Regions:
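Second-shell loop/turn segments in exported
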Residues: 1-6, 21, 58-63, 100-112, ...
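Solvent-exposed loop/turn segments at secondary-structure junctions
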Residues: 19, 25-26, 42-43, 65, ...
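Structural recognition of the beta-strand scaffold that forms the well-ordered cores
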Residues: 28, 34-35, 71-75, 84-88, ...
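Alpha-helical metal-binding/catalytic segments enriched in His/Glu/Asp
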Residues: 72-74, 87-148
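Metal-dependent peptidase/peptidase-like ectodomains
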Residues: 142-239
Length: 239
């Protein structure tokens, strides 16, 4: 699912079909896609290269191409339709590396099909309640996050209502446990300036008897982690 490649386009198409099948409206009127483009350097293959007079200049100059990409965005309108909460995960990964000797495919089951499946399940759960959320919920699947989180950056920079977004919940690599001896262990990041995010999880664990042992990690800086960076540019509370 390398960004801009065939696998990534198929993944975007699949996610859009999942939203449609679940009955989740697209954020835009026409469809769930938010297309954008970016430049990237051509990947060079390993091997022997003939040395020409201008070889150094050519190598320094590099070869670029334009890639077409797309975020996938769905929404459930809330009782306060002009206030928003975003639930997101990136769906791209590293694709295929032909220079590798054995398995050349980066499958990306944990990074980040696990987060994508969580966002889809949350969207379905919202619909299953039959109730309107308090705020409008946007379900966002970001393209090209692995190399500069361009998908979420593009959304933030082009969103006309970004000042009305009240928070962002990010799901990334939730399919594995860094402490095998503690199967209920989970890492939970949140913005330090908004400790209520930590309090809410503690309350839910007690209320619903969730089998989780969170490792609470408060971020002192609003820029936070890799995939929350674009949202943090607008100083959104994040978890």
């Amino acid at each position: 699912r390398e960004a801009g490649m065939h696998g990534s386009r198929l993944a975007a198409r699949y996610l859009a079909s999942c939203l449609k099948e679940a009955g989740i409206a697209p954020l835009e009127k026409d469809n769930s896609y938010q297309p954008f483009e970016a430049y990237t350097k051509e990947r060079q293959q390993r091997g022997r290269w003939p040395v020409q007079r201008d070889s150094i200049a050519i190598l320094q100059q590099g070869v670029h191409r334009i890639l077409q990409m797309s975020n996938v965005l769905g929404t459930i309108p809330g009782e306060r339709p002009d206030e928003y909460v975003i639930v997101g995960a990136h769906f791209d990964h590293l694709g295929v590396d032909e220079t590798l000797a054995n398995d050349r495919i980066y499958n990306g089951a944990d990074d980040n099909a696990s987060g994508v499946s969580a966002v889809l399940q949350i969207a379905r759960a919202f619909l299953a309640t039959g109730q309107k959320p308090l705020r409008t919920v946007i379900f966002a699947f970001w393209d090209w996050e692995e190399n500069g989180f361009l998908g979420s950056k593009y959304f933030v920079q082009s969103c006309p209502f970004i000042s009305q977004v009240k928070g962002y919940l990010n799901f990334d690599m939730i399919g594995r446990n860094n402490k095998p001896e503690q199967p209920q262990h989970v890492v939970y990041f949140y913005t330090a300036a908004h400790p209520v995010f930590g309090d809410w999880l503690k309350q839910d664990i007690a209320r619903y008897s969730l089998r989780l042992q969170p490792d609470y990690r408060a971020w002192a800086r609003p820029t936070g982690g890799r995939y929350n960076a674009a949202s943090a540019l607008c100083h959104l509370p994040i978890t």
